[in-house]
């Protein structure tokens, strides 16, 4: 990844724990990958290939050559938030009502004609979509993260104003959960779940171990496990907006979570490294 604090701390911890077993950690180095080249690494913790296409291809090749990559680069490539919402709703996780929207515009290098879009219904019945998800609503990309291109809209006018700024991204329109509590769970190995109080408005982690009731905390952990086992993620963050005791899974496609010490607090940084 591109962080400054996590990679060296993690490598140091691997070296400390792995020394009796002949295991060492190091930064992966890539400089042109030959198709018959064996993987030089037994296990790779991938935290950047979603942003660098060459890295993603190299991670897939590493798997082919016998390496183990966290997270699985094939599923990560195929995944998107809207599909995940639909899967989890079928598995009984509380999910806000969500609509997948046609794109406002398309990348300039794609040669589209009127015939390319003849399957689209026009005009879109925006009132019906808002009636389904409720008002206010959240407009956000159907894939990607980092709180980019996320809008809270109160009505049709605000929705259309925001939608007009979203090209070339495919977006979702989602029910807004006016939460009483909000948590972000660090998850590892699918089963190791660490719920953390989180302020999404300030994007700030808060050390508070009495934040959730035992009942809500247990459901948050159980739902996070369901999500990770269904999607196969071994490193992820899962966000829940909790309203009247019901945890709604808001965001859980984060296979390369931000682990920078100053942002997740020194307390949680040490736990994440371990």
State each model region's role:
Residues 2-3, 50-51, 76, 143-145, ...:
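Short, solvent-exposed loop/turn segments at secondary-structure junctions
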Residues 161-163, 172-174, 182-199, 248-253:
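Beta-strand scaffold of nucleotide-dependent catalytic cores
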Residues 66, 201-209, 252-258:
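Short glycine/proline- and charge-enriched loop/turn segments
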Residues 203-247, 271:
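A long amphipathic alpha-helix within ATP-dependent nucleotide-binding catalytic cores
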Residues 242-274:
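C-terminal active-site "lid" helix and adjoining low-complexity regulatory extension at the edge
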Residues 63-66, 74-182, 214-222:
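Active-site nucleotide/adenylate-binding loops and adjacent lid/helix of ATP-dependent enzymes
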Residues 152, 187, 240-242:
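Conserved hydrophobic "DFG−1" position in protein kinase catalytic cores
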Residues 2-115:
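Conserved N-proximal alpha/beta basic substrate-recognition cap immediately N-terminal to
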